[in-house]
């Protein structure tokens, strides 16, 4: 039963990460697994579970502040292409995404669909 609870927790972490960020599910899953493993190890060694929870919450707050303070807006077509290329692992895809975003604007919507036709 504990394994199922853990698996459901990790599934929920991955789903929430995908819903909010659209990326980073592997990182979120690895972090969740490490938090559970180390949390259980500390509780087994006598740590207070509520103290651990408070410590994790403080760490999350600090990390969030640090990330937000170092974040940079992506504004130019070149920045979009570079960022999308890194995310996709392919600069040509990054260039296509930047071109599509340039055409639809900041408030536009881009829909990507799978195709059975090669090259289209």
UniProtKB/Swiss-Prot annotation:
Instruction: State its Enzyme Commission number(s).
Output: 5.6.1.7
Q: Which reaction does it catalyse?
A: ATP + H2O + a folded polypeptide = ADP + phosphate + an unfolded polypeptide
Q: Which SUPFAM superfamilies match?
A: GroEL equatorial domain-like (SSF48592)
Which InterPro entries does UniProt cross-reference here?
Answer: Cpn60/GroEL, Cpn60/GroEL/TCP-1, GROEL-like_equatorial_sf, TCP-1-like_intermed_sf
Binding locations of ATP: 23-27
Q: Which GO terms describe its cellular component?
A: cytoplasm
Please state the protein's primary subcellular location.
Answer: cytoplasm
Q: Which Pfam families does this UniProt record tie to the protein?
A: Cpn60_TCP1
Q: What does the annotation say about its assembly with partners?
A: Forms a cylinder of 14 subunits composed of two heptameric rings stacked back-to-back. Interacts with the co-chaperonin GroES.
What's the stated role of this polypeptide? Together with its co-chaperonin GroES, plays an essential role in assisting protein folding. The GroEL-GroES system forms a nano-cage that allows encapsulation of the non-native substrate proteins and provides a physical environment optimized to promote and accelerate protein folding.
Q: What is this protein called?
A: Chaperonin GroEL
Species of the source? Mycobacterium gordonae
List the lineage, top down: Bacteria, Bacillati, Actinomycetota, Actinomycetes, Mycobacteriales
């Amino acid at each position: 039963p504990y394994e199922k609870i853990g698996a459901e927790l990790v599934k929920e972490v991955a789903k929430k990460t995908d819903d909010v960020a659209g990326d980073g599910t592997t990182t979120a899953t690895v972090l969740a697994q490490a938090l559970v493993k180390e949390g259980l190890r500390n509780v087994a060694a006598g740590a207070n579970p509520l103290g651990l929870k408070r410590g994790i919450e403080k760490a999350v707050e600090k990390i969030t502040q640090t990330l937000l303070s170092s974040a940079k807006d992506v504004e130019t077509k070149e920045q979009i292409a570079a960022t999308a290329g890194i995310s996709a692992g392919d600069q040509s895809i990054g260039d296509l995404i930047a071109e599509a975003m340039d055409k639809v604007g900041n408030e536009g919507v881009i829909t990507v669909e799978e195709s059975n036709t090669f090259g289209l």
